[in-house]
Amino acid sequence: MHKRLILPILITLALPLVFQSTPTEILKLKTFDALVKEQQPSGNFVILNISESDVRERGGFPFPRRDLAQIQVDLINEGAIGVGWSMSFSEADRFGGDDVFAQALSFAPSVLAMFETPNGQYPQTVGTVIKGNEVGGIPTQGIVENIDVLKEQSYQGIATAPVDIDNLVRRIPLLMKTPNGWTPSFGTEILKALTGTKSYIITTNDNGIQEIAVRHLPPIATDNFGRKWISWVDTPQTTLEEMKVAGKFVIIGTTANGIMPQIATPVGLL
């Protein structure tokens, strides 16, 4: 009797592994979380968060782009080697400050964010070298670009944080697939800005994407979809008042309430 039960029991236990059921997948992810160790900062980056008090002092958000231009210039004067704005500028500034902001962006390597929206519009694929077949990648349904005068003076990359099955973010795409090619992520564009290059290399295999590479830097291994597991790093932070940015690439975000959504991760909200 017991022998007759063994096979059905084994089949039942194996089914979640075969079909990757939700509980099994969550268990795998939680196990991964427990094994991940916090990494030491590279020393190359600093985060500058626009705070609630900054927004209040300037009468609301978004700031006029003349103000953003001044922030950019101040950062460069304090020794920043580049600036990444984790925000998009898809519409003209109602105060007419776009030309001033564009000029400030040209003073140092600068990166602007783009965001997904199902508009069926995509940036032109440029500076992309593919070794292998065009397979793998996460398709996007549309992207909102920055206005021409700003993107002509900067890099622009897509900022997206797709969640895993338990609604936590662990993997970030380093690029996304468009109908006519590829568009690099915000992080990939920062690497290009830091090295002063206009191109990157995608290497694929039979299963999908294998790695991406930016000249002068080691290749970055990805999963088949072009995603990189996040390495948790307690990156140094500064403020508009302190501006401790000498020798760093500055990534500008905001912690002010209601401006940008927070991202849930295994280590808390970002």
Residue ranges and their predicted role:
Residues 1, 176, 229-233:
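Charged, glycine-rich intrinsically disordered N-terminal tails and low-complexity linkers that flank
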